[in-house]
């Protein structure tokens, strides 16, 4: 399960419907061009939390079909609706996903006992493995190393997608849980995360920048920090330009420039303006 995983983008048409042809093209681009090890399906990058249960299921089906067993697949099934999370966990396990993942329950201020109950309910409903999706800056849920340890007592909870900038906590977790998978979740921090011993990374920009992501990861693992830093500098220049132009819209526009029907974002995300489109063309030309 280790390696470089793209947090899969989803193509929508102008009316917000899933564009199956475009989604399949994004999946093939990730596998054939970006050379990723796996796909993280149904996460923030997939605009998941704006989708119906049926739409989520269809995306999971398309990804499984189009990946053709060539890469590992992780299904993000987490939801503030626990019944939906369990339903999606069962659905994706039956489809054959290699693991499931679940974001910490958000919006309401759940205490840790409620969070633990949430994870145990999901993983105990299926014969599969679970990766915790920790993204405190969006969920407001910050868990301590002691709380992670309590969750990891369940052998079916095999790791965490660590989307945070707390490198002290990351280092403490690496030391405390040598047998658990830790995936870096911030693309712009891959080098320091790799030096601290993560097992891989899951990122939105890998949909276009997967090759550089692997270069950083492999160079840092070999101790070639100079090369890794050089590629991280270029990557972070790219990420800065993307963020300044609109994250998901710009990644999709770059893919469009590369011949992939990446489509539109789901409302209430805004449609790309002419200025954003022109800037994305410049970004594509500059970095690819």
Swiss-Prot record:
Pfam families: DHDPS (PF00701). It comes from the Bacteria. CDD domains: NAL (cd00954). Keywords: Carbohydrate metabolism, Cytoplasm, Lyase, Schiff base. Its EC number is 4.1.3.3. One of its GO terms (biological process) is carbohydrate metabolic process. It catalyses: aceneuramate = aldehydo-N-acetyl-D-mannosamine + pyruvate. The keyword Lyase applies. It is found in: Cytoplasm. Aceneuramate binds at residues 44-45, 163, 185, 187-188, 204. GO terms for cellular component: cytosol. Pathway: Amino-sugar metabolism; N-acetylneuraminate degradation; D-fructose 6-phosphate from N-acetylneuraminate: step 1/5. Gene3D superfamilies: Aldolase class I (3.20.20.70). GO terms for molecular function: N-acetylneuraminate lyase activity. The active site is at residues 133, 161. Belongs to the DapA family. NanA subfamily. Catalyzes the reversible aldol cleavage of N-acetylneuraminic acid (sialic acid; Neu5Ac) to form pyruvate and N-acetylmannosamine (ManNAc) via a Schiff base intermediate. HAMAP family: N_acetylneuram_lyase (MF_01237). Homotetramer. This is N-acetylneuraminate lyase. It comes from Clostridium perfringens (strain SM101 / Type A). The gene is nanA.
């Amino acid at each position: 399960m280790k390696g470089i995983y793209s947090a899969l983008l989803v193509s929508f048409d102008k009316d917000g419907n899933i564009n199956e042809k475009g989604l399949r093209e994004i999946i093939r681009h990730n596998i054939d061009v970006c050379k990723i090890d796996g796909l993280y399906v149904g996460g923030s990058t997939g605009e998941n939390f704006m989708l119906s249960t049926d739409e989520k299921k269809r995306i999971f089906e398309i990804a499984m079909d189009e990946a053709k067993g060539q890469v590992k697949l992780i299904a993000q099934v987490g939801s503030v609706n626990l019944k939906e999370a369990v339903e999606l966990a069962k659905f994706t396990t039956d489809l054959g996903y290699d693991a499931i993942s679940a974001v910490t329950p958000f919006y309401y201020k759940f205490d840790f006992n409620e969070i633990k109950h949430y994870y145990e309910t999901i993983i105990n409903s299926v014969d599969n493995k679970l990766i915790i999706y920790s993204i405190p800056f969006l969920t407001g849920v910050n868990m301590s190393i002691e709380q992670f340890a309590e969750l990891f007592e369940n052998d079916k909870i095999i790791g965490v997608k660590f989307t945070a900038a707390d490198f002290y906590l990351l280092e403490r977790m690496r030391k405390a849980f040598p047998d658990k998978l830790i995936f870096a979740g911030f693309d712009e921090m891959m080098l320091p995360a790799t030096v601290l011993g993560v097992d891989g990374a899951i990122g939105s920009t890998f949909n276009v920048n997967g090759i550089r992501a692997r270069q950083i990861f492999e160079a840092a693992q070999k101790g070639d920090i100079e090369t890794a830093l050089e590629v991280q500098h270029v990557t972070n220049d790219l990420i800065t330009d993307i963020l300044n132009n609109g994250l998901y819209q710009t990644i999709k526009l770059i893919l469009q420039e590369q011949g992939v029907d990446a489509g539109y974002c789901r409302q209430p995300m805004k449609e790309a303006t002419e200025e954003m489109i022109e800037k994305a063309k410049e970004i594509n030309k500059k970095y690819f």
